[in-house]
């Protein structure tokens, strides 16, 4: 949601009993050994993440102002422009189904270059941050035959520009040639 990590919410139907896995002190009843029974303090051990809550609130305000539809359209346009350029490059293998709706992510390999090496070149020579390796998806890499090489993942977001997407595609072209 564009807010800080480590902040979230919990929606529970009336009558559902929740017992915390771990408990700790509360600022409400500091001398009690047991967690309070009343909600929400029963689930709020320790100090609340005030900064995270404020950041999450700002993220919600931002999303309400910009709208998720506008963000989706922007990210999709960036991803599509990047994909159109890199998918036509000789020696570049792009993974995934781009004929249907998808997340604004393009995963690829450049020839037989190790994905970590490609990511390092993109970072050092072009100032482009990507993710390389197995992406916590070892079975997918087994299916693709990319276990040893990994893959390079480009992720596009609201704060990226079309110029950045085109620059990234040009960098892939330069490395591939």
Q: What do the PLM-derived regions correspond to, one by one?
A:
Residues 1-177:
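Pyridoxal 5′-phosphate
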